[in-house]
Amino acid sequence: MQKEAYPVSTVLQHYLKQYKKDTALPIAYKELLHYEYTNAIKDGNGKHTHWERVVYNEKLLAGLKKKLLRLYRQLKNETGIGIGSIDFCEYANSMPFRINIITKNNKQDFFYIKSADASRIYGLLLEQLLTDNHINFLYHQNTLVEEHIEGVPGDDFLETISILNKSEMQLLAESFIRFNESCFARLLGDMRSYNFVVVKNDTAINPFTIKAIDFDQQCYEGKLNLYLPQFYKENYGFVQLATTLLGEEQIEAKRKNERQHIAQLITKNHEALTPLLAIMKKEELSETYKMVSLRKELNEYYCTQHFSNCKTMGCLVQQQLQQLTGIKICTAY
């Protein structure tokens, strides 16, 4: 069942304009919907993926390609020389189009054009403000454009962990613990292994980074466990690494370090974060019964009543950040 898309409010649009995210685009999402037919895309094993290759009439396609190349340059500040393909995924909440770009060095890059959803935009903004991950994205009216996030999908990476040595496995487990804590801190849900990627870094200290790639479930669900990646069966391989290779004290130390890092980012980015949370607190981003359920579970989890006055999911996010970091966030805006 697909999640309901929430409209981008006028006040959120003003925020996006202030931070140069809402800007005129050369193409709108709805223009890509005028295809003639699609062909199913199969993986290397001959199985159907959720993606379909879209086919347009030649005249329309010529115009779309020019606009898409202009959009890529606007998004990445790089020049593409051609469009390799345009794919569509009806399965995902945002019903994205995946654009394959041919770059000047004859390499491939991708970006995505999606139907805008306030939940996803809040998720993208919180990712930028509360993690070290930067994501290029643009919005205008009902169109959301995102760059491709490089990395190996978590489910694919799990199939290759046997080639890692014990030290690498331990570092991967530590990265998952940090990711788990980060998602919980900002109430980002549905982080199953196919909704995040593993990035290999050129550093011995921290060779793995886990990055979210799907932000549709930002503070939407009513169950606390859905905001903790450790509880998804798809992530069992990562959880097993952590519980096998790390002791309880090590795990708790990594969680504490991540909370301290988030606290530093809250302080560093307070000028952008404070007004964002102020707007978010007034938005409807989920069904009321889910908010009530999550509010109750958070109170029980922390043995507190600090969440009791919250009436929206945005308020729960703010209180959650305060609860985990000890930093008071003033959202008068």
Which residues make up each language-model segment?
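C-terminal catalytic region of ATP-dependent kinase domains
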Residues: A204-Y333
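Short secondary-structure transition/capping segments
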Residues: V54-V55, I121, L130, S182-R192, ...
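AlphaC helix of the protein kinase catalytic domain
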Residues: D156-I163
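Regulatory N- and C-terminal appendages and interdomain linkers associated
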Residues: M1-L75, T288-Y333
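Conserved kinase catalytic-core segment
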Residues: L164-N225
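Conserved ATP-binding subdomain of kinase catalytic cores across diverse folds
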Residues: G46-D155
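Short C-terminal domain-edge/linker segments immediately following a structured domain
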Residues: L130-T131, N142-E147, R178-F179, L228, ...
